[in-house]
Amino acid sequence: EYAGFSDHTPWEKVNPNYKQINVKNALADKNSIFYYYQKLIELRHTMPVITNGRYALVPGNEEDEQIFAYTRQDDDTTLLVILNYTDETVNRHYNVPADAKLLISNYEDDQNDTIRPYEAKVYQY
């Protein structure tokens, strides 16, 4: 009755979409946001560059109101993080080395310079 959180009336209203968006469904879907965040946490624990690397905003991105792009870099690794904060598809070119690996993304494929609505992707090189 209360989205599985309690047998008692909660002080906060339960979201009306709780039957579709809930932990039980997220655990059953390997592509859910639950597992996406697990992967992010795993990367944070296994890649020191994420917490200790030098931060730098990508040149030319200072005034971009749609895309936030930055690097984290240490002596061994560079991460390029590209985030689209809008509900629009945006085209931007970043100099991603040919040998760069797409480390994580919230889309299943990489469309290079096309950054889809709310897309977040991290390249490692």
Regions found by a protein language model. Give the residues of each.
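Beta-strand-rich binding/interaction modules
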Residues: 88-107
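Generic hydrophobic, helix-prone segments enriched in Leu/Val/Ile
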Residues: 39, 55, 102-104, 108-109
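Loop/helix patches that line or flank the sugar-binding groove of alpha-linked glycan CAZymes
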Residues: 1-79, 85-90
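A short, polar/charged loop/turn motif at coil->beta-strand junctions and beta-hairpin connectors
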Residues: 63-64, 97-98, 117
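C-terminal beta-strand-rich structural cap/linker in extracellular carbohydrate-active enzymes
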Residues: 110-125
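A short, terminal or domain-edge coil/loop segment
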Residues: 18-23, 104-110
